[in-house]
């Protein structure tokens, strides 16, 4: 099978290697000529993985959309949410047959605040869309690239497509489960980034493990409350795209959102981070989207509200954490 992977960042490169390890013909699209040359000649992607990690030498990196996607059986979208629309616009002229599109991003559309699956399926003509799935869950690229055992989900409304993508990616170090709850899976992996920033802030403010465990647990309550309102299923939030992704993202140095929170916490302000940060930190935008939707539909989400005030109203993280801790006492079920 030919697979075109759009995006030569950490996750795109890691997924490209998985597919190459599974004996597929993989073309990896980059926007940077030096990165293409390094991948093809030295079999490294040093910007993201350093000089010590070598990647599968069969990966073919390219600057050309045509080379990457033409005649591909599958196309993997491994780019930040802000780039999804432009990427689809650029690749569509080269799609000549029905193709399965696989989304690997976590977040919301930048123009409409819709879930990514909804927008991607709207942008691709029906006669070119053989199927759609999301490959998501608790998978840090830094571990997948060195072939550490990882488990994620192939999520699609069409169970046959979910199974097809499951087989495409599964091997002895990447175990893929299927899921048909598109709403729950997408909301779970998106909102957990907000909680991960909050967890990092606690670390930056020198709170302990007890505090972070409590915050992450209460954060799961908020994810479930929001997700159920919009049609997600409880079992999804208890699975890999829910609590699984939440656990790994809220506690790992590999998580950009967690690292962002640590910086914000140490500064006791988001101002410098937002001004100078160059990494893709999806949780920042997701905070605004989820806050606005929760406010519109009267969904109780105090952690998300506090994060919105920190990121968008320049509230002091230390004050917001105290406000959350001092909320009225209630049952844990609430």
Question: What positions do the PLM features span?
Answer:
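Structural beta-sheet core signal
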Residues: 5, 28, 101-103, 134, ...
């Amino acid at each position: 099978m030919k697979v075109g992977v759009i995006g030569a960042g950490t996750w795109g490169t890691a997924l490209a290697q998985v597919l190459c390890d599974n004996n597929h013909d993989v073309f990896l699209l980059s926007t940077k000529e030096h990165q293409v040359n390094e991948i093809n000649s030295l079999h490294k992607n040093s910007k993201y993985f350093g000089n010590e990690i070598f990647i599968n030498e069969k990966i073919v990196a390219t600057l050309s959309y045509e080379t990457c996607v033409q005649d591909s059986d599958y196309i993997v979208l491994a780019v930040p949410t802000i780039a999804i629309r432009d990427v689809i616009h650029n690749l569509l002229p080269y799609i000549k047959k029905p193709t399965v599109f696989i989304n690997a991003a976590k977040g919301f559309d930048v123009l409409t605040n819709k879930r990514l699956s909804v927008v991607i399926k709207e942008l691709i003509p029906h006669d070119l869309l053989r199927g759609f799935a999301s490959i998501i869950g608790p998978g840090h690229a830094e571990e997948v690239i060195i072939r550490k055992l990882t488990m994620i989900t192939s999520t699609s409304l069409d169970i046959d497509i979910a199974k097809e993508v499951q087989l495409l990616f599964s091997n002895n170090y990447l175990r893929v489960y299927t899921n048909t709850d598109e709403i729950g899976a997408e909301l779970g992996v998106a909102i957990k980034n907000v909680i991960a920033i909050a967890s990092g802030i606690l670390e930056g403010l020198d709170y302990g493990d007890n505090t972070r465990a409590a915050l992450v647990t209460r954060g799961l309550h908020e994810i479930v409350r929001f997700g159920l309102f919009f049609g997600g299923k409880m079992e999804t939030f208890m699975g890999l795209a829910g609590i699984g992704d939440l656990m790994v993202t809220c506690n790992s140095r590999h998580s950009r959102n967690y690292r962002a929170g640590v910086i914000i916490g140490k500064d006791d302000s988001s101002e410098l981070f937002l001004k100078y940060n160059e990494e893709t930190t999806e949780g920042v935008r997701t905070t605004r989207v989820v806050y606005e939707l929760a406010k519109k539909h009267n969904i109780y989400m105090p952690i998300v509200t506090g994060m919105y005030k920190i990121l968008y109203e320049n509230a002091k993280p230390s004050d917001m954490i105290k406000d959350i801790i001092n909320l009225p006492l209630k049952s844990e079920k609430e």
